[in-house]
Amino acid sequence: MKIQGKMFIWLAVFILAMAIIYGVWSKEPAGTTALFLAFGLSIMIGYYLAFTARRVDAGAQDNKEADVADDAGEVGFFSPHSWQPLALGIGGALAFMGVVFGWWLLYFSAPIILIGLWGWVFEYYRGESRTQ
């Protein structure tokens, strides 16, 4: 986290310099305000990361000799035979085609998305009365 905090603080310094240069040269208030707000956001994130890095133990990303696998945690449960992602993919494709070809396609895509989402969330749910 130390490296990420330093990166955001240096990014904030760069954004501040660009905001001052942009504000002086362009005299345009909207872009100058947006750049100063981006500076503030970057400072807040950088300070938070630097402050948190002092409170927690050093992670694998702070060690220059670490491998990627050193920081990898448990990925989670994988459902190899699930059809629900296919339903969500088809529904999402129809929804985005509705943006291109006509909003009427959303009437067909919304039920497919809802069925796919409902099925994926409750795929392994067996009820409250059963014990695992």
Curated annotation (Swiss-Prot):
Lipid bilayer topology = Multi-pass membrane protein
Q: What class of enzyme is it?
A: translocase
Q: Which segments cross the bilayer? A: 5-25, 33-53, 86-106, 107-127
GO-annotated cellular components: plasma membrane
Q: What is this protein called?
A: Probable cytochrome c oxidase polypeptide 4
What does it do? Part of cytochrome c oxidase, its function is unknown.
- Pfam families recorded: Cyt_c_ox_IV
Organism ancestry = Bacteria, Bacillati, Actinomycetota, Actinomycetes, Kitasatosporales
Q: Which reaction does it catalyse?
A: 4 Fe(II)-[cytochrome c] + O2 + 8 H(+)(in) = 4 Fe(III)-[cytochrome c] + 2 H2O + 4 H(+)(out)
Q: How does it assemble?
A: Associates with subunits I, II and III to form cytochrome c oxidase.
Offer one example of a GO biological process linked to this entry. Answer: electron transport chain
Keyword vocabulary terms for this entry: Cell membrane, Membrane, Translocase, Transmembrane, Transmembrane helix
Q: Which InterPro entries match?
A: Cyt_c_oxidase_su4_actinobac
Q: Which GO terms describe its molecular function?
A: cytochrome-c oxidase activity
- Superkingdom: Bacteria
Question: Where does this protein reside within or beyond the cell?
Answer: Cell membrane
Stated family: Belongs to the cytochrome c oxidase bacterial subunit CtaF family.
- EC number annotated for this UniProt entry: 7.1.1.9
Disulfide connectivity? none
